[in-house]
Regions:
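Cysteine-centric segments in proteins
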Residues: 1-81
Length: 81
């Protein structure tokens, strides 16, 4: 079931060169360890560049957004079977 969330979250990420790689995030008091990054893409909205990550743990899929202008992470969607 797909659930639109659109909530700010805290993310632990690795930064290598010009690339951010989310490792885990905190949502609703739970720490979710990212097991796989399924898809990444970026787009500009005005002068801000947004990075999107489709990630999964062992059971769920999530869509994360990173705003490079204000360094804010957002959980956009969650999907669970």
């Amino acid at each position: 079931m797909l659930e639109e969330i659109n909530e700010p979250i805290e993310v632990i990420a690795k930064f290598t060169g010009a690339q951010a790689i989310p490792v885990k995030f905190l949502w609703q008091g739970r720490e979710i360890l990212i097991k796989k990054i399924n898809l990444t893409y970026a787009r500009f909205e005005g002068r801000s560049k947004f990075y999107f990550f489709a990630v999964s743990d062992n059971a769920n899929y999530f869509k994360l957004q990173f705003n490079s202008a204000n360094l804010q992470w957002t959980l956009l969607e969650s999907y669970a079977d």
